[in-house]
Amino acid sequence: DAIVDFLPSPKVIPAISGVAPRSVDEVVVAHNEDDPFCGIAFKVVSDPYTGRLVYFRVYSGKVTGGTSLLNVTKGRKERMGRIVRMVANKREEVEELKAGDIGASVGLKDTFTGDTLTLENRPLLLETIKFPEPVISVAIEPKSKAEQEKLTDGLIKLAEEDPTFQTKYDEETAQTIVSGM
């Protein structure tokens, strides 16, 4: 019941609006399968077997694997890889997703949480997710220099998955500083 209450299908909520980046005009997005594709990425997971898995919701239109898209938030072209529908921790490969569907894709290299994806010929920027600034920071270091690369790789993956997590290297103290919620 909570999912239905807090995450209703786009088909049962009022149309949403976005901004056309070139003209800054407001555009209304109807939740219709016949309109051009528009979706938003809401989660990124690093999978040890398939790599990055980007979860997204389709607000209008439909999308198939191999479709050329525009990441409007970043201004970069992307190619939709295989599309899967997640059922618990199992993946069900599907041909296409339509307005109202939630799915995931492998192969979106430059897409992160909150990014808007559209067809290249109809760019539209939906309201992005606003994340709070980190509230705590701590210095970390590996047990040995040999583990530095593993630590760095792990921190990069964690930062991709969690937009509230940040990492930086402090030149003065020669320490890695991680910040988060």
Where are these regions (language model features)?
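Structural and coupling elements of P-loop NTPases
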Residues: 1-181
